[in-house]
Amino acid sequence: LIGFWYQRDSATFAGLKAFIINRIGDLGFILGIAAILYYFDSLHYQTIFKDIPKFIATNSTIAIWPGTEWLAISVICICLFIGAMAKSAQVPLHVWLPDSMEGPTPISALIHAATMVTAGVFMVARMSPLFEYSTTALSLMTVIGAITCLFMGILAVIQSDIKRIVAYSTLSQLGYMVIALGVSAYSAAIFHLFTHAFFKALLFLGAGSVIVALHHEQNIFKMGGLYRSMPLTTAAMIVGSLALVGFPGTSGFYSKDLIIELTHKSQIPGAQLAYAAALITVFITTVYSFRLIYLVFFGNERMEDNTHMQPVHEPAKTILFPLVLLAIPSIAVGGIMIKSTLDGFLQGPLFVLAKHDVTQQFLQMDFHGALAMFLHGFISLPFLSLLLGGCIAWLCYIKYPLLPQVLQRDGKLLVALLQAKY
């Protein structure tokens, strides 16, 4: 599907890149499966989970290279996680995902919201009884998630393609999910996976609506002032962006702030680094979301480069109807689901050791219902980070619109580094 427009070289290469990177991940995944088969003599979930305590007691080790013994459980978990890194686009196996924008926009929405990129997160959560016994693997996941979350968010700030900005935001949000897996907050990771699907599909389809209206223009610097002619698309994109930045009351707020709170409570090595990265990422997310909304829908029209046969207008109802359908859960689903998520709605297939159970600590000490969490959201650190990001974006794009050009001119090396994707 990424290579759907097969006559374009860029689309063909993007499909090939996605295929190759995922085969690298699959190598780790199949090694993990082979090790499970070797040690457990089965590939059935229930058999493996039942035999884990017995396997841990044996203290089996694997010599990765001569003179180096690693616990077999850690090697298995790390191999499985390498598979998840490719599917869920974690650094350094993330490079296929921005290029997947070569596919049609509804395909981008499908890949990023509901199918491929969530597969790795789901697999790790499903294998939680195995991962819980490897602090090494949990710590690795926490650090990798933090790196992805922060550094992929930074790349979104300099993008000019509307779809690529949303794609990098997906990478950043996947980083949050992997941080949650690393701190044993599996239910929070699945909850964010669930809420993220709605607002990410909304953002992609909203971007698609803009692209259709502008005759397939994707450069945000050739847009502007679209709120006058596309009010419904504008409202939908603002709702999606508020959920993305985690504005209190939106579905993204409940799942993302939950992950940040649980990470702060975790004792896993690397958790406090991830907490700091998550807070900085809230700031960065607000900057690039505000930038996208302002440059596309507000300010002066910059469509002189496009030759339009007719004035810009909202596309067909078939494009607008899904935006309305997705905007409702993007606001409401988080508040509805937060209580059942914390109360053990997913406890059947998930397993957490008592010493890692940050969710129970949060439930007993800090959670007093969806309304209390909403009100507390306005005095929390993530909200302050969000406000700071909003202020910086306002200064750069409304108060002093020439400031980004000055910064770009003075920081040529940094801009070159970001444009080369590190």
Region annotations inferred by a language model:
Residues 1-311, 315-318, 329, 335:
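Hydrophobic transmembrane alpha-helices and their helix-loop junctions in integral membrane proteins
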